[in-house]
Regions:
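N-terminal glycine/serine-rich phosphate-binding loop of ATP-dependent small-molecule kinases
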Residues: 1-96, 124, 152, 225-226, ...
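Active-site core segments that coordinate phosphate-bearing ligands/cofactors
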Residues: 5-6, 113-126, 137-172, 181-197, ...
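Short, acidic/turn-prone active-site loops that include or flank metal/cofactor-
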Residues: 31, 98-105, 178-179, 264-266, ...
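Core-facing hydrophobic residues within beta-strands of well-ordered domains
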Residues: 72, 204-207, 392
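Short linear loop/turn motifs
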Residues: 205-215, 323-326
């Protein structure tokens, strides 16, 4: 039997899933990674540690009996987007990887936005608004503050592209990742605004060739085969940005399909035939499917809200008990709202000063109501992202949070959409494996996926529909409060001695 391997390079975890030729998952392996976060906005990853984690999960897959009895036909990759991953000619890191959540470039961003019409031109060209997460702005920061690091590098990569280079020895960028802030969405060429107005054209020698997601991108090297036990010369596909790979993996491949990834970032996407600005806070990336783009609303923090809840409110790591507690609370959580902005927000509105918080607590508020309010706050954020789009229809849910049936029902009730979910939730890895199969011409159409549907309950939806305007008004009215808070804290932080 033929097998396909999907590798997903996440922000806090790397995973590999082995699929048979019917795209049934046969084996999986995962390793946690340790991003480094600092108070000054730096968010970085030790690239060598990440590589060792990838090797470890590949060794586990190689030992699986099913693979030893069959043939590994091809490998595909998906990975976290944005960021800057620099290497030398041999693939050795030049400094740590800069992550999408890094905000060190905020002051330079403010300088650029003071140029008349710059953000309008930037959005028209790249399909995204200027934000600190953007690779283009992170490169701009490096050019200003660490030019020696750029001079020492031979290649610029995104996370999964660097891992693929280490696997194959073939340097390449890939279309979906590059479309996030470097490409002109209409022409597919490098953005003239980024290259000329930001002065990054001098960095073009660092950019490897650009490949389509399902293009062949080399084969597994003898050295990596020896380190992992996987067969040498196995074809490796270019792969895709994780949010695009997840769309492919869950079945959001047709115009109008909507999906949400309940992961580190709660990211909602709408598949379009071309950039269609329905909500001004959107950003566009190229889909894995030819001729399509995805209108994205990636929140700054998704499931970390649930992590915070378990650590500080629930005081219980058992998600099953938490689900049972919130299932017993009426929709609306007794009028308590949670604003899910733990680390600022980037979509469906932009505010680096935004912060999370409860609203509406009374002497009668219970712990269970606080707990349910956090889940509802993230569901309201999905409603917020979908303003202006047709109501009803289906909403594909994927990511680690999609394992919670209670949360999926809350989302169905809150959005008024039929939530479509799969018991198998590693759908970004599944998308990567599908791209691998396409790269060796072994797949004519996307294989079906067993799915469960959660229907919105009319009474619960009516209650949430009445509460959503309060949620929206609250975050709009809080914008100046968040800004005032940040301004008040700045002199205090300057007085603190290291």
């Amino acid at each position: 039997m033929d097998f396909y391997l999907g590798i997903d390079i996440g922000t806090s975890r790397v995973k590999a899933v082995l699929f048979d030729q019917h795209f049934t998952a046969c084996a999986s392996a995962a390793e946690n990674t340790s991003p480094r976060l600092s108070a000054n906005g730096y968010a970085e990853q030790d690239m060598t540690q990440l590589w060792h984690s990838v090797l470890a999960i590949l060794r586990q897959i190689a030992r699986h009996p099913a693979l030893q009895a069959g043939r590994l036909r091809a490998i595909g990759l998906a990975g976290q987007g944005e960021g800057v991953w620099l290497s030398d000619e041999q693939g050795e890191p030049v400094g740590p990887g800069i992550l999408w959540s890094d905000t060190r470039s905020h002051e330079l961003m403010s300088d650029l936005l003071r140029r008349p019409g710059f953000n309008r031109r930037y959005f028209a060209d790249t399909g995204t608004h200027l934000q600190p997460c953007n690779t283009s702005l992170q490169l701009y920061w490096l050019k200003h503050y660490q030019p020696a690091r750029l001079a020492a590098a031979r290649y610029l990569f995104f996370a999964k592209d660097w891992i693929r280079f280490r696997l194959t020895g073939v340097a390449a960028l890939e279309l979906t990742d590059a479309s996030s802030s470097l490409l002109n969405q209409q022409t597919g060429s490098w953005s003239s605004v980024v290259m000329n107005e930001m002065g990054l054209n001098e960095l073009l020698p660092l950019f490897p060739p650009l490949l389509a997601p399902d293009a062949p991108a080399g084969t597994l090297s003898d050295a990596v085969a020896a380190l992992t036990g996987l067969p040498a010369a196995t074809p490796v596909a270019a792969g895709a940005l994780d949010v695009c790979s997840a769309a492919l993996g869950c079945g959001a491949v047709n115009e109008g399909d909507i999906y949400t990834i309940l992961g580190t970032t709660c990211c909602t996407g709408i598949v379009c035939r071309g950039p269609q600005t329905v909500n001004e806070a959107t950003r566009f990336v190229t889909h894995t499917e030819a001729g399509q783009v995805i209108s994205l609303f990636p929140m700054q923090a998704g499931t970390p809200n649930i992590d915070w809840l378990q650590q500080h409110i629930s005081l219980d790591a058992d998600l099953g008990r938490l689900e049972q507690a919130i299932a017993e609370v009426e929709p609306g959580s007794g009028g308590v709202f949670w604003q899910p902005y733990l680390n600022g927000e980037r979509a469906p509105f932009y505010s680096p000063d935004a912060r999370a918080g409860f609203f509406g607590i009374s002497p009668h508020t219970t712990r269970a109501e606080l707990q349910r309010a956090v889940f509802e706050g993230l569901a309201f954020a999905i409603v917020d992202a979908l303003q202006g789009y047709p109501q009803g229809g289906e909403l594909y849910l994927t990511g680690g949070g999609a394992a919670s049936a209670t949360w999926l029902q809350i989302i169905a009730d809150c959005t008024g959409r039929t939530v479509v979910s799969s018991a198998f939730n590693e759908l970004s890895a599944r998308g990567a494996a599908i791209l691998a199969a396409r790269s060796v011409a072994a797949l004519a159409e996307t294989p079906p996926l067993a799915q469960t549907r959660y229907q919105p309950r009319p009474q619960a939806h009516a209650r949430y529909a009445a509460l959503y305007p309060v949620y929206r008004l609250l975050r709009e009215q809080m914008l100046p409060v968040w800004q005032a808070r940040q301004a008040a804290l700045q002199p205090l932080s300057q007085d603190v001695q290291p």
